[in-house]
Regions:
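N-terminal targeting leaders that direct proteins to extracytoplasmic destinations
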Residues: 2-8, 16-77, 94
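Soluble periplasmic/extracytoplasmic beta-strand elements of cell-envelope proteins
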Residues: 68-70, 77-87, 117-121, 142-143, ...
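Short, well-ordered coil/turn elements that cap or connect secondary structure elements
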Residues: 16, 64-66, 113, 154-156, ...
Length: 203
């Protein structure tokens, strides 16, 4: 009976050791959700302030260049917002010729894959059915990804594109002005593990 009493404890200890020894599943950004990609990699509390300061510098630089930029995830991620009308004709998935005026200045930051993981999310209003909005935004996200691929000299940029349809409006879909706000592109600059480690070493 004494031996049986300790069996659950032994099994629990064994399971803990096996779990610790098992290889951790690697994070795959291309199959992760947008929420997971914006949240990963996480920043330790003691590095959060320094990472937010570095991202704050990027936010200030891009604002000075005329972009609409917000710091999200406790200031650790920069989010650039561009109205779809500045990049695409209505219902079109090909970039306008003048779209490069908005996209090209971001290329140097997008190519800093050692510092930033770049997530591109395209949103729509609720005009048309859900399937149409999903396809439209997905095709537009891929068009932006392709633009940066060619703009970089056919180099892989590591951009992770998402077409999110009309599921995440920032304003009620009532009136032209509000619908235009909802038709938007969000470009996220997420600090990489390399940047976080660099900041940690330099503290």
């Amino acid at each position: 009976m004494t031996r049986l009493r300790f069996l659950p404890v032994v099994l629990a200890l064994f399971c803990t050791l096996v779990a610790a020894a098992a290889p951790k599943e690697e994070f795959d950004p291309m199959t992760a959700s947008i929420e997971e990609n914006i949240a990963f990699p996480a920043v330790e509390a003691k590095q959060s302030g320094a990472v937010a300061a570095a991202i704050g510098h990027l936010v200030a630089t891009l604002r000075h260049a005329g972009y609409e930029v917000d710091a999200v995830r406790k200031g650790e991620v920069a989010m650039v917002t561009i109205r779809c009308a500045e990049l695409f004709a209505p219902n079109a998935t090909e970039l306008l010729p003048q779209a490069s005026k908005k996209l090209a200045p971001l290329l140097p930051y997008i190519m800093r894959s050692d510092n930033y993981k770049v997530v591109v999310a395209v949103h729509s209003d609720n005009t048309g059915d859900e399937m149409y909005a999903d396809r439209l935004t997905s095709d537009r996200a891929n068009a932006i990804d392709e633009y940066y691929f060619h703009a970089s000299g056919d180099k892989e940029t590591g951009i992770i594109p998402y077409g999110l349809g009309s599921d995440e409006p920032v304003a009620p879909n009532s009136g032209r002005a509000n619908r235009e706000k909802n038709r938007r592109v969000e470009i996220y600059f997420v600090p990489t593990a390399e940047l976080i480690e660099k900041i940690k070493r330099n503290k």
